[in-house]
Amino acid sequence: MTRESESGLPIEPVYGPDALDGWDPAEKLGEPGSYPFTRGVYPTMYTGRPWTMRQYAGFGTATESNARYKQLIANGTMGLSVAFDLPTQMGHDSDAPIASGEVGKVGVAIDSVDDMRVLFDGIPLDKVSTSMTINAPAALLLLLYQLVAEEQGVGAGKLTGTIQNDVLKEYIARGTYIFPPGPSLRLIADIFKYCRAEIPKWNTISISGYHMAEAGASPAQEIAFTLADGIEYVRTAVAAGMDVDDFAPRLSFFFVSRTTILEEVAKFRAARRIWARVMKEEFGAKNPKSLMLRFHTQTAGVQLTAQQPEVNLVRVAVQGLAAVLGGTQSLHTNSFDEAIALPTDKSARLALRTQQVLAYETDVTATVDPFAGSYVVEKMTDDVETAALELMRKVEDLGGAVQAIEHGFQKNEIERNAYRIAQETDSAERVVVGVNRFQLDEEEPYEPLRVDPAIEAEQAARLAKLRAERDQGAVDAALTALRKAATGTDNVLYPMKDALRARATVGEVCNALREVWGAYVPTDAF
């Protein structure tokens, strides 16, 4: 009996040579590390070394998160991934009325260079790669990181890492935007230019499908809308006067990995192929690195359950395997208790151990792209590619990603798919172990990690002390220069860095830009 994939595509019970009738491996596959990069962006992939194990972490104060990072490094993690709290993500200080009740809850609270210094205390920034999940205020957090590196005596040329910096998906699926799309894209172009000149090894953006998938996007929707956003960013940078080969090699992507292994592997392979062709054929990129879709993967939090949470260990292992078989460059495996609360030290360690088992106790790293030539995976790769290209065409017909966002196209498509998933789960047509089948009569108690509510008062006290100690005249002058740059065409990151060095807060810098650029107010898409 034919089944339907997450993207609504048929999965036949048996595949044979007829599934690939007329299929040209030279056109569709190529060699690993070669155009169109279907088989992976590097010739040897994991046969030389495994993917980067980058565990996402951050909660409470900078002191608490610093201790967690040091523990992760001691446990063998290869790169840090910083989670920020909602006030930081929205450009508000911890003592702002709107921040009440959210300080330190879903990530670490960072208000100034003082907090950033504590966050990375004892962690040599020339020895670790750091990813920061921050979007609308990404420029600020990058500059704070650079300032702390300078205090450590580390030159910007030695800094490696990534800022997410993908604001378009915030309008589609997540909501942590600050400025309207126009100024937001201008700020992203300024970041591209700044990093090329000042922090050349930094990945300037992580164009993200993960959040769309968590909101309900199918695999085909996930890569279609993500790549459409990527096209918008490339056009923005080119329009700002940059050569495509000057910035495209530093672009990166971020996808989800679900338990549906076959379609997930197909999705990753299709995304690489589409992006390579877009960059070559539409933008005329010449540097092979400009054609490579390098991506980070996080296992699907939306598939984790609060019921029988230990079963999530199995889900995460399967999701991680799908990401590895699909050729991810780095991976975060969720902790089994994340459907309940922030992970404990033990659950975070188990999540990392899951990756280590995949890397060192299986044979998936022994050969490149193990599914190459598989009837089912090659057919599904073609099918996902076709479905994604059709959605990308619809975005283009609306005028590109920004215009499609204003029409509510992506959001509506994702919400329709999310509703379908909810209906199938409620009816038990879609089996979720422990939720609609194989339930327990009584759940075992589980004690989650709890964030101390006193953190909010602690952060407010730190801010009061900072404002009392700093040179307010220097702060005011720097913020005035920032407003002037934002009003004109100068790169805003240079005066922004001066303001942050003078100990202006994240909220003060964002408020200065709000005065010039305004704040985004969403329109009803329905």
Model-found features: residue ranges?
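Short beta-alpha connecting loops at secondary-structure transitions
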Residues: 101-105, 169-179, 212-217, 255-260, ...
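Generic secondary-structure signature for well-ordered alpha-helical cores
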Residues: 78, 121-125, 150-155, 189-201, ...
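Flexible glycine/proline-rich, aromatic-decorated loop/lid segments
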Residues: 243-247, 285-299, 307-336, 343-368, ...
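Catalytic alpha/beta active-site cores
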Residues: 1-258, 263, 282, 289-296, ...
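Flexible, glycine-rich loop/tail regions that form catalytic "lids" or insertion modules at the edges
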Residues: 3-22, 31-37, 86, 344-345, ...
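Extended, hydrophobic alpha-helical segments in both membrane/secreted and soluble proteins
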Residues: 141, 230, 253-279, 295-321, ...
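Generic beta-strand/beta-sheet core signal
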Residues: 54-56, 82-85, 131-135, 162-164, ...
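Phosphate/diphosphate-binding loops
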Residues: 111, 129, 134-137, 149-151, ...
